[in-house]
Amino acid sequence: MQAVQQEIAQALKVQPPFEGAAALEQEVARRVAFIKGCLNNARLKTLVLGISGGVDSLTAALLAQRAINELRSETGDAGYRFIAVRLPYQVQHDEHDAQACLEVIKADEVHTVDIAPAVRALAAETEALKGGSPSLVDFVVGNIKARTRMVAQYTIAGARAGLVIGTDHAAEAVMGFFTKFGDGACDLAPLSGLVKNQVRAIARSFGAPESLVEKVPTADLEDLEPGKPDEASHGVTYQQIDAFLHGQPVSQEAFDIIVATYRKTQHKRELPFAP
């Protein structure tokens, strides 16, 4: 492991690879206990999470629902609830995957909020967007989508006295692959420190189908490039990112891309700047 790999892995609190099924089960139990502790410390009983159809939100939701189930069982209090939220922009092209995730999760409640009217209204009223290039406008509006989704989740959490769960993990954090105050905003991040293949392993341990576990990850925020794979944006694969974070050798090109992207996106991981 090179020094910079160790530095980054420590900063992101990257967890070591799972050494067998027992280690995986132990990590699942630890993260479920973390979620329960967050609720208890806040003296709240509700968790809220947006479900996209990808493995990250699927895995976070499975952990959350298990935590809620355990709290209900341990306390006898039926007031503990997990709310899964669908947040499509009009009609999502992979809505079938989102619905398949909901079938696996079996959330206590499912809410749906179409973010399109709010996103369009804000974009239409923003003078700075007028006259911008199509690609720039598309990118900025993509970030509006992410932030609107978080506004919706916090609206539900506020109405139901709950906490919002985030889906960020180490393989996304190292690349700064999240929107500031959008999907990067949350009250607790139960996937923190995990690499992508560990997120998949946890989902698989819950019995999630391989079609969802191995689905090609995509942020799907930009209309000009719908369904664009994360890896196309990264310039490296998640396999390479995972290997880097676990101190394993990667190609020099992948190494340079990951380190440069980590440094360039540091402002997203340390907010806000202060004198």
Curated annotation (Swiss-Prot):
It comes from Pseudomonas entomophila (strain L48). Homodimer. The lineage of its organism: Bacteria, Pseudomonadati, Pseudomonadota, Gammaproteobacteria, Pseudomonadales. Keywords: ATP-binding, Ligase, Magnesium, Metal-binding, NAD, Nucleotide-binding. Deamido-NAD(+) binds at R147, K180, D187, H267, K268. ATP binds at G50, I51, S52, G53, G54, V55, D56, S57, T167, K196, T218. Pathway: Cofactor biosynthesis; NAD(+) biosynthesis; NAD(+) from deamido-NAD(+) (ammonia route): step 1/1. One of its GO terms (molecular function) is NAD+ synthase activity. PANTHER family: NH 3 /GLUTAMINE-DEPENDENT NAD + SYNTHETASE, NH(3)-DEPENDENT NAD(+) SYNTHETASE. HAMAP family: NadE_ammonia_dep. Mg(2+) binds at D56, E172. Catalyzes the ATP-dependent amidation of deamido-NAD to form NAD. Uses ammonia as a nitrogen source. It comes from the Bacteria. GO terms for biological process: NAD biosynthetic process. It catalyses: deamido-NAD(+) + NH4(+) + ATP = AMP + diphosphate + NAD(+) + H(+). Belongs to the NAD synthetase family. InterPro entries: NAD/GMP_synthase, NAD_synthase, NH(3)-dep_NAD(+)_synth, Rossmann-like_a/b/a_fold. This is NH(3)-dependent NAD(+) synthetase. GO terms for cellular component: cytoplasm. Its EC number is 6.3.1.5. The keyword Iron does not apply. NCBIfam families: nadE, PRK00768.1.
